[in-house]
């Protein structure tokens, strides 16, 4: 006899959900991105790329490694081209209202952090391991 568990699958051997601000999230977010094995889906309501964008470089590296990179954005031709240039698939949604990053369909970064751009201490995000919740968020994005 075995009890079925609905506990989230912990892909990175740690189970911590933590709240971050617009400056403290970067270190952990980049660690999580670096460990991505299959997919990274980012939804960004605003695109503010610096001339040298660390996140774009990381996403380009992931794409080159065979990790599927998908970006949900509002229409912006110049920024779309930058994202296509790093190997990301682009999904345009001009009514986009959610800022989220989902790594390997189980790790969620959710809040008002701009994962593809500029942030301040006023921005925040929560990091959650939950594959069922990740599937629900992906369903919202893709419909």
Regions found by a protein language model. Give the residues of each.
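PLD/PLD-like phosphodiesterase catalytic module centered on the HKD motif
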Residues: 1-143
